[in-house]
Amino acid sequence: MRKKQKLPFDKLAIALMSTSILLNAQSDIKANTVTEDTPVTEQAVETPQPTAVSEEVPSSKETKTPQTPDDAEETIADDANDLAPQAPAKTADTPATSKATIRDLNDPSQVKTLQEKAGKGAGTVVAVIDAGFDKNHEAWRLTDKTKARYQSKEDLEKAKKEHGITYGEWVNDKVAYYHDYSKDGKTAVDQEHGTHVSGILSGNAPSETKEPYRLEGAMPEAQLLLMRVEIVNGLADYARNYAQAIRDAVNLGAKVINMSFGNAALAYANLPDETKKAFDYAKSKGVSIVTSAGNDSSFGGKTRLPLADHPDYGVVGTPAAADSTLTVASYSPDKQLTETAMVKTDDQQDKEMPVLSTNRFEPNKAYDYAYANRGMKEDDFKDVKGKIALIERGDIDFKDKVANAKKAGAVGVLIYDNQDKGFPIELPNVDQMPAAFISRKDGLLLKDNPQKTITFNATPKVLPTASGTKLSRFSSWGLTADGNIKPDIAAPGQDILSSVANNKYAKLSGTSMSAPLVAGIMGLLQKQYETQYPDMTPSERLDLAKKVLMSSATALYDEDEKAYFSPRQQGAGAVDAKKASAATMYVTDKDNTSSKVHLNNVSDKFEVTVTVHNKSDKPQELYYQATVQTDKVDGKHFALAPKVLYEASWQKITIPANSSKQVTVPIDASRFSKDLLAQMKNGYFLEGFVRFKQDPTKEELMSIPYIGFRGDFGNLSAVEKPIYDSKDGSSYYHEANSDAKDQLDGDGLQFYALKNNFTALTTESNPWTIIKAVKEGVENIEDIESSEITETIFAGTFAKQDDDSHYYIHRHANGEPYAAISPNGDGNRDYVQFQGTFLRNAKNLVAEVLDKEGNVVWTSEVTEQVVKNYNNDLASTLGSTRFEKTRWDGKDKDGKVVANGTYTYRVRYTPISSGAKEQHTDFDVIVDNTTPEVATSATFSTEDRRLTLASKPKTSQPVYRERIAYTYMDEDLPTTEYISPNEDGTFTLPEEAETMEGATVPLKMSDFTYVVEDMAGNITYTPVTKLLEGHSNKPEQDGSGQTPDKKPEAKPEQDGSDQAPDKKPEAKPEQDGSGQTPDKKPETKPEKDSSGQTPGKTPQKGQPSRTLEKRSSKRALATKASTRDQLPTTNDKDTNRLHLLKLVMTTFFFGLVAHIFKTKRQKETKK
């Protein structure tokens, strides 16, 4: 075996670094917080498809940030920022008695009122299931341990023994139990997330804390059960592990369990039975499970708006999809505890403004600042030396703005927003440079202020937010994949200050932060009900608390759209502990099942019936009214904003004491249907709230959300139409080449995981060098050393010419793609396999092949579950899924190759929504194993080095490529290049080849081979020496045209038909598509593609056309099978890692070779 080609060290280092980055992007557990660890680049919204969202939100390990107008290339930190702790401001320690809690300053959910009635959780146990914890944080403290449920380690061990729990440790009086359910024996890498979540639920920092304000959770006196669960052996095992944690938490006395993690778009039906039983067990014992909705926004993630033709754009997944859980969305309140800065305005008034710092400025120091435009040009920074640079957001990455300012001598950076009412953004840390983000309003004030001086305050304060009260952009929308209403309720989740590892505190954002606040409120409300309703069972009190909490929530209103945020985004509204604690009434659906109304499919006219419950001893007089609204549409996309249709008039009702009464509200949206169907042809949501007040002029007392779908929701299309059918060549995740809409490149030489995402059929293109090697007896493809590689391409695509590495759809006259295969075992277009962009979750996917009579000749194995391709992001999921089980090798049920002809390749699947019927996608596939017949003789002119064949090739399918190949040694790698025919059909043979280092290698006639390939992938090849021998007994000549002194006796060389060159192959009768031999078949003219060109034919060529981009060593071939692998349909992160590792390493080798040959080609061009 030849010595392997050495790889340049720097290229290897780059590849390994890229692999590391991509693998690190695959989070084991998708905690519902997002980090600024992986900055991303914003792109302009002018791209026609997919459209970018216009709202900005700060940082995510899991998803990319939304695009905004004016921000062409800007790296930002996403708005759900996970692990970005801030260093505490430099402040002097305050006496313990003066330390206020964070809630004393700002309590948008009014928890303090509930605490006054129900206490702070003393004697109660709460559980947090999460990825990791700092078990010894200073905030894990009880004020009076004599009131604790577990007084000692011995008490805990007794409880464990009663329930057969043989694991778990006592940490201290506060953390009564800790256990790692992942069983991986590793210390949690992420201790931040679980610590932050636990602090919101039950933190209780000491007065001696160095922070200016003391952290106090919703239930600060409750004991904690900390349960670490992380993905180790796949999602199913993961779900079983947290199911065990749920059972243990219930058995150890937890009243509430918080689960701030999830897997987007997974359906409840996908969970193992053990997990479903654990949810039911907790419910039966009256234990509340609170989950976060997720940070995946909607279908398309945070970088794309969903298409208005596909209304099933919800992405709330598991465990949040479980009906028994209380699922929490995130919103930003109108006021926030924040760092502040002070300036004097032109009228000498002090102006205080909120700032979000990355590296804090020295407090109480007056800084000069200078305006630096958008921080792009050197001239922008002419006045910033020794000052703070004030820079507008936009055009370039934040890190570049900061770096440019530092290079110019600035001492810090202030970046202000380029849009009104935006969320604050965490800026990247650039060499510890002090930097902060401010609102557009404040930035413009600083720009125009004549006094260019600013001071940063030492102590944070509560100030109005620039965004106002608004649902967080990242917060995941419903419905669930099963078609159920989620989320249930909303809570503050934007820039929440809580505990992180090592006795520190930080602001993080995400639905992970929203859930533990609601968990604490639920725990306190149930505690209140123990006294208020002593005759109820724990499960009855749990049911009541959930209904009251949702009923008393305040529906959030979008001031910009003058409509309520959708119930599919906010659930019942913003949690209000004060209203819940005082509530004597609540509202449910007509069956008293839950405090939300799911109407499923509706017509233009329908009714909403709800039940109002009065638990007081007096009759209650109420006024009620319904809002009717739908989705706002912007062009072809949902704007992810509400659109009000109308509001019904207020009506009056009296509810008897200790009784209930039904209310029916008629809805008539018929006058809007024509316009709405024109915007949303596949149907639309009609939704809103039925709201109740004690007086029409007063604030809302309670409300209930309702959702109906005007159309057939269950039978919405589950799969995007094939890319072959796209009029403009684009799909949701695929942007067409504007100059060649039918261009569809295979996986070959670049990392196409983020690009080739559409519905199509895949196949493989195998070069003749590998086919020849296999025919000559090489059993292991890894032992083949060749500059060519096997590529995964898309069926029906072909390269137009050898020096164009791109593939293009070739179509029949009727516009259908020319998808043809030749299942003869040579690895070249031998199979087809389904790849789909799923718009919805589906089940029971199966492929089958039908002959022209409609008989099923082959059926694949079943793929039971398919998850919608809700994003195109390495950290979450890709924009399409390949299904290995659907690979058809052109054989029937008995394993025999089918007869030549045209077949229907059908993929069947069923959406998992209730009432859905089976759907299918069809492709026409030609099967043809007819070997091309080629000339048996040729002549060669030594004068102009032209090779002239005696006849044209005869093929059953149109000729794809007719070429002369030659192979030479470039160092230790056999290198193959090709010559296309001249306009007259002759070939001009070169005398020598050039290596990558510029050396020349003489070519002999025996180095050349005539290769013909048809569009089904049938290949025939013949040595040129054989063709010349077929014409005369001319001795072999070397590259100079001279006769060698002595020609060694050669063994008979085989051509592509396995015949010896001294024996003319017997021509077999050519068969037509039915397998019958026609009386006479005329020579097939090459079929032209949609551009009028014949694939593979290059006019006026004849010179060597190098397959430069396709060169690779055998090390790359070893990974070729990875492109066939089915991408995970269960969102399994561990499996994703393996697939991505293969793809990345393949990319490295292909990309390296492409780079080397690109450099070589550039050198040749300069000559």
Swiss-Prot record:
It catalyses: The primary cleavage site is at 67-His-|-Lys-68 in human C5a with a minor secondary cleavage site at 58-Ala-|-Ser-59. Transmembrane segments: none annotated. One of its GO terms (cellular component) is extracellular region. Residues 1131-1167 form a propeptide. InterPro entries: C5a/SBT2-like_Fn3, C5a_Peptidase, Ig-like_fold, LPXTG_anchor, PA_dom_sf, PA_domain, Peptidase_S8/S53_dom, Peptidase_S8/S53_dom_sf. Pfam families: CHU_C, fn3_5, PA, Peptidase_S8, ScpA_C. It comes from the Bacteria. Residues 1-31 form the signal peptide. Residues 1044-1071, 1078-1090 have a biased composition (Basic and acidic residues). The modification Pentaglycyl murein peptidoglycan amidated threonine is found at T1130. Residues 99-581 form the Peptidase S8 domain. Residues 34-73, 1029-1133 are annotated as: Disordered. GO terms for molecular function: serine-type endopeptidase activity; toxin activity. A motif (LPXTG sorting signal) lies at residues 1127-1131. It is found in: Secreted, Cell wall. GO terms for biological process: proteolysis; symbiont-mediated suppression of host innate immune response. Its EC number is 3.4.21.110. Belongs to the peptidase S8 family. This is C5a peptidase. The lineage of its organism: Bacteria, Bacillati, Bacillota, Bacilli, Lactobacillales.
